[in-house]
Every structure is written in structure tokens, then in C-alpha cells.
A protein has these predicted regions:
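Glycine-rich loop(s) and the adjacent beta-strand/alpha-helix scaffold that form part
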Residues: 120-127, 135, 139, 167-246
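Short Gly/Pro-enriched turn/cap motifs at secondary-structure boundaries
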Residues: 207-209, 253-258, 279-280, 393-404
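Conserved FAD-binding subdomain of flavin-dependent enzymes
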Residues: 1-27, 135-139, 218, 222-225
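Helical element adjacent to the flavin cofactor pocket in flavoenzyme catalytic cores
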Residues: 55-72, 106-178, 214-223
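Terminal amphipathic helices with adjacent charged low-complexity linkers/tails
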Residues: 27-65, 355, 361-373
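An anion/pyrophosphate-binding glycine-rich loop and adjacent beta-alpha core
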Residues: 38-46, 53-102, 217-219, 223-348, ...
């Protein structure tokens, strides 16, 4: 509610200042990172989002292996982390002198790291935050119990006074001097809780680590905690899945590389668009779930043409990819010579999909999306392609073959 937002705004700066002064946790403001909620009073182009400063994990010694790596799909060359600005350069390393310099600056140290480490030691984003927090705890000589899952919260006269955890040395009873903080992750891999709390169509996959089984939530509810009734109490990402040859399931979030770029639309089982594809990943899914009440929108399909997929990529298919046979063979993407044929292959209404493409192509000329306002707001346009006009988020779907 409002009081929680006020508490966050009031206390957030104090938290950042204290971490900066007393720990190795350092943040930098993202100068170009528009607000996700658009057309609101005070909307800003950047400066609000804070990102952890890149961290050299070599200082962790053997504890570096305790930092859970990102999903394999998120790392380049088998173990290299990059931030968003670097990613743009690495995707087109020879397009400019600046891109070439950035690529060499990132790639050469990585190859040196791999002579000794299982992956690159330069951590960015969430991994950098975890690494900096762990290093700070080590500097303060804080005792950390690994492999010690929570089993039960201890209650005395209606107040939580401690916890029981399983450790490598057996079950331990811990009495807290001040309080117990539940920081055990969400419920992403708890089938019963997902079935209870998540909408239909969102219960199968997650980007969260598989250790996120809702232990904190379950134990909190047992001692009288209450779960609020917010409409969307989780973070949604539109994802595609691909079963790898080794049997593992790759889950790819469609965040910035494809969904917001000109020349792509998202449609439901009726072949109709249902949302502004360029809105934030969370808002995209909120719109998708809302549309589910009228038309089957989970799963949905991303539709593009040959020119788009080679310029921007599509999900796991990176920009510039020349060979799509592997992805076609395993059904990650579907290819067709015409939009109607594509509709028939994926099982959506062919006439409606054709009309959705016709309308999109008209919007590409006028620069105005009359259905969902695609390309309005700072964030929409920032994630588009500034070289395309009149709207950086809308482009024609014309060049066969077509893909879903």
C-alpha cells in the first residue's frame, strides 16, 4: 500500500548511503533507464534505477564457487557476463571502433579468467550484488551457515523468537536477539503454492533458481503471517522455452533484444494483438493475463519476418544468426512462406493474423499504433530502434519467410 511505498522512498537513500559507507556494496545510477510506468507526473528518463558496480570475484577466493551463476543462456562464450551497454557492442563488434574496443576490453580478460576459473570472474548486475554482499560479510568475519534450510519458526507468546534449521551438523535451534528476517526467495518452484496463487498459464516455468520453493512464505503463514491480496504479487516475464539436447529446459525472457524492436507483433490464439508489445516485461504479461479472459493468450506468439530475425534476433536466436535449422528442427520457431501459412502452422485464425499484420504495416507508415499506443512514452522509444522512423518501435512485416 501507500505506506509501504512511502517507507521505501524515505528509507531507501539511507540504506544505499550506509551500504556505500560501511560495505563493499556500491551502486551506480543508470543515467539512461526510463521509468517503466509511462505518462505519469514526474516521469523520468533516467537516474532512478541503481545498478551494482561490476565486481571482480577473484577476491572471494574459493567462495567464488558459492555465487550461483546466471542461467547459461545469459552468459556469452560459455561463462562471460556483460551488462546492457556492453551487449550492444558485442552483438556488432566490428561496426565501429568503439564497439571493437569495448569487445576487446570485455573478452580478453574473460579468456584469461578461463585459464583458472570455471567462468569469468567479472560479475555484473545481480551477480555483482551477491558477490559484493558476500565479500562484505567475509570482511566483517560474519559467520555464515551454508546448506542450512529453514525448517520451522519458533513462536513464543505470539512472537517469533527464532528458528530451527537443518545444518551439516544436524538440526539446530537458533534464538534471535532482535528478530528473524525471512529472505528465502519466492514460491517459483513450489507446485502447490503456484497452483494456489498463480493464474492459469503461469504455473510451469520460472527464471528463478530451483531452490526458490517458498520455505519462508510457508513457515510465515504457519505462525500467523498474512499474505496480501495484490493482483500481481510476482514479477512477470514473457518467456519462450527450448529443450536442449542434454534434456535441460532453456527459458529465455524477452526483455529488450526483440520484443520492443520495430517489425514484431505479439498475437493470441485468435491471431489478434492484445497488448502494447513495447511496454515493460511485467506490464506485457499483465496485459496478456487480462486478455486471457476473452481469448486464449497464454501461450502467445511473437510474429516477425526474415529481415527482423536477422537484424534483431528472436529469443535464443541472436542478431545476425545465419543458420536457423537447429531452432526450426526442434520447434523453437516456426517458418512459413506466407502469413496465412504461418497462421495455419501455429493454429491461430489466419484471416485475423493477416489483418493484424496489415494494420501493423499501416502503423509503420503513420508512426501511430491506433490499438495499443506502441512507441508512446520514454521507455517504449528507448527500447526501440532510434534509426527507424517515424516510430522507433513499429516496422513493417513484409519479407518472407515469416516466423513465429
Amino acid at each position: 500500500g501507500e505506506h509501504l511505498r512511502e517507507a521505501f522512498l524515505r528509507s531507501g537513500p539511507d540504506m544505499v548511503a550506509e551500504l556505500d559507507a560501511k560495505t563493499a556494496v556500491k551502486f551506480a545510477a543508470a543515467l539512461a533507464h526510463p521509468d517503466y510506468v509511462k505518462n505519469q507526473p514526474g516521469e523520468a528518463f533516467g537516474g532512478r534505477a541503481l545498478a551494482p558496480v561490476a565486481f571482480d570475484a577473484k577476491v572471494l577466493g574459493d567462495d567464488f564457487d558459492r555465487v550461483l551463476p546466471p542461467r547459461p543462456e545469459f552468459m556469452g562464450l560459455g561463462g562471460m557476463m556483460v551488462n546492457r551497454n556492453e551487449l550492444s557492442a558485442l552483438l556488432r563488434p566490428v561496426s565501429s571502433v568503439g564497439n571493437a574496443k569495448t569487445t576487446l576490453k570485455v573478452v580478453l580478460p574473460y579468456f584469461k579468467d578461463r585459464l583458472k576459473y570455471k567462468r569469468g570472474t567479472r560479475l555484473v548486475m545481480g551477480n555483482a550484488l551477491v558477490g559484493r554482499l558476500l565479500y562484505s560479510l567475509k570482511q566483517y568475519q560474519t559467520e555464515i551457515w551454508y546448506e542450512a534450510p529453514l525448517q520451522e519458526l519458533l513462536l513464543e507468546e505470539g512472537r517469533v523468537i527464532g528458528a530451527i534449521v537443518d545444518t551439516v551438523n544436524g538440526r539446530q535451534r537458533i534464538i534471535a536477539r532482535k528478530g528473524v528476517v525471512l529472505a528465502t526467495g519466492g514460491v517459483a518452484w513450489n507446485p502447490a503454492l503456484r497452483q494456489q496463487y498463480f493464474p492459469v498459464g503461469t504455473r510451469d516455468y520460472s527464471l528463478a533458481p530451483q531452490l526458490s520453493t517458498g520455505d519462508g512464505l510457508s513457515n510465515g503463514l504457519k505462525v500467523g503471517a498474512k499474505l496480501d491480496n495484490e493482483d500481481h504479487p510476482v514479477l512477470w516475464f514473457p518467456c519462450s522455452t527450448f529443450k536442449k539436447p542434454n534434456g535441460q529446459m532453456a527459458v529465455w525472457p524477452h526483455i529488450i533484444l526483440d520484443r520492443a524492436k520495430p517489425g514484431l507483433i505479439a498475437v493470441n490464439a485468435s491471431g489478434k494483438r492484445f497488448v502494447n508489445e513495447t511496454d515493460s516485461y511485467h506490464d506485457f504479461c499483465v496485459g496478456q493475463l487480462a486478455a486471457q479472459h476473452n481469448n486464449a493468450s497464454t501461450p502467445a506468439y511473437l510474429i516477425c519476418d526474415d529481415a527482423f530475425i536477422h537484424k534483431y534476433g528472436l529469443g535464443l536466436i541472436m542478431p545476425g544468426a545465419q543458420k536457423l535449422k537447429h531452432y526450426l528442427k526442434h520447434g523453437y520457431v516456426v517458418q512459413a512462406a506466407t502469413v496465412r501459412e504461418l497462421a495455419n502452422k501455429i493454429g491461430v485464425d489466419a484471416h485475423e493474423l493477416e489483418q493484424s499484420v496489415v494494420r501493423n504495416n499501416a502503423y509503420a507508415i503513420t508512426g501511430e499504433d491506433l490499438e495499443f499506443g506502441r512507441g508512446t512514452g520514454k521507455m517504449n522509444r528507448f527500447n526501440g530502434d532510434a534509426a527507424i522512423g517515424p516510430n522507433p518501435c513499429i516496422g513493417p512485416i513484409l519479407t518472407a519467410p515469416f516466423y513465429a
